[in-house]
UniProtKB/Swiss-Prot annotation:
Subcellular location: Cytoplasm
Any GO molecular function: protein-glutamate methylesterase activity
Protein's UniProt name: Protein-glutamate methylesterase/protein-glutamine glutaminase 1
Annotated GO biological process: chemotaxis
In-chain residues carrying the UniProt-annotated modification 4-aspartylphosphate: D55
Ranges for region Disordered: 138-174
UniProt-listed SMART domains: REC
Response regulatory domain residues: 4-121
Organism of origin: Vibrio vulnificus (strain CMCP6)
Pfam families found in the cross-reference section: CheB_methylest, Response_reg
């Protein structure tokens, strides 16, 4: 049976092209369209589609308000279309906070010209999030900025510096009521890589960390260049730790999370205790900018076994080769479990390669981190 899709957009051209692209995939079927958020809510309740594609800026009711109403009444996987502007980024993050599962840049030229990459990406995203209808959740609870958070001064100098693994021991899966035990390892860096579903996952984790988190955190989230500054700002307003978009030459400091800028590669240079970030363009042939493998690989060279790393929800296999390098250096690698992932791609690639030691539900990752670093 085909996946039923409701297409929502106030542009007749965009509705028609998105519908044509979706219907070109035999596993998908557009069952109706809506021209504004109010109509989308009504049709979502009546038709109960498997997936909804949603514009943000629409008359009568905007996309964010529609997402909130749909999630409150008939939770459905929603894929947002967003403009590549700072305001568009903020609105998209609001939509994800309200319950949307994923987003795609709204590129009229690519859609109009039927470019293979844009067509395939849209079809794949719809199919991927359709599998998560049972996963649907209420909006993220924490949306109130932390008050009177002490601010530290960040040191920002202007310059700075395959083969499949054999089968490993079974991955440890924590029962719901299990109490975690620290491994006893000492860490100097936490590294987290993610893609689809990552903004919500990172918010859930980072908002639970205290301001005295004992070492730096590097974050690699697949995201367009115009989105990462807005995402870092949002996280910074919600978290006790500091969160910033990484800049070339940043000196890594404890209690600060550095988000890799979209469209760039983030590497670590120097030595433990005096490490700096290098932000570079990277090769055009790289599939992802930023790329989890790139940052993880550089972390392995600098910090070796002193890295606590995690691969969270996301499509594809980015992070697997970086995790392989971390594993060879003796670092700790965790993967998000399948049930709590929006897309079980990246964590699955790491787990199947025998690289992760623990398979954790999203809701307990922060708790596990605090135990592991000696704060719980």
């Amino acid at each position: 049976m085909a996946i039923k899709v409701l297409v929502v957009d106030d542009s007749s051209f965009f509705r028609r092209r998105v519908s044509e692209i979706i219907n070109a995939e035999s596993r998908l079927e557009v069952i109706d369209v809506a021209v504004n958020g109010k109509e989308a809510v009504e049709k979502a309740k009546r038709l109960k589609p498997d997936v909804i594609t949603m514009d943000i800026e629409m008359p009568v009711m905007d996309g964010i308000s529609a997402v909130r109403e749909i999630m409150a009444s008939v939770p459905t996987p929603i894929l947002m279309f967003s403009s590549l502007t700072h305001d568009g980024a903020k609105a998209t993050l609001d939509a994800l906070d309200a319950g949307a599962l994923d987003f795609l840049p709204k590129k009229f030229e690519d859609i109009a010209r039927n470019r293979d990459e844009a067509v395939s990406l849209l079809q794949q995203r719809v199919i991927q999030i359709a599998s998560k209808r049972a996963f649907m959740r209420r909006p993220v609870a924490s949306s109130t900025p932390v008050q009177e958070r002490p601010q530290s001064t960040l040191n920002r100098p202007t310059t700075g510096l395959r083969r499949e693994a054999p089968a490993q021991a079974p991955v440890s899966r924590a029962p719901v009521a299990a109490k975690f035990r620290a491994s006893g390892k000492k860490y100097q860096l936490t590294a987290i890589g993610t893609s689809t579903g990552g903004p919500v996952a990172l918010q859930k984790i980072l908002t639970k960390l205290p301001a005295n988190y004992p070492h730096p955190i590097v974050l690699i989230q697949h995201m367009p260049a115009t989105f990462t500054a807005a995402f870092a700002s949002r996280l910074n307003s919600l978290c006790k730790i500091q969160v910033k978009e990484a800049e070339d030459g940043d000196v890594l400091q404890a209690g600060v999370a550095y988000l890799a800028p979209g469209g760039k590669q983030m590497m670590i240079d120097g030595r433990p205790g005096a490490a700096r970030l290098r932000i570079i363009d990277g090769g055009e042939r790289m599939n992802y900018k930023p790329c989890v493998d790139v940052t993880f690989g550089s972390a392995a060279k600098i910090y070796a076994d002193k890295v606590l790393s995690m691969v969270l929800t996301g499509m594809g296999a980015d992070g697997r080769e970086g995790a392989r390098m971390l594993k060879s250096a003796g670092a700790t690698i965790w993967a998000q479990d399948e049930d709590s992932c929006v897309v079980y791609g990246m964590p699955q690639a790491v787990a199947k390669a025998g690289l992760s030691t623990e398979d954790l539900p999203l809701e307990r990752i922060a708790e596990r981190m605090l135990v592991e670093v000696g704060l719980a």
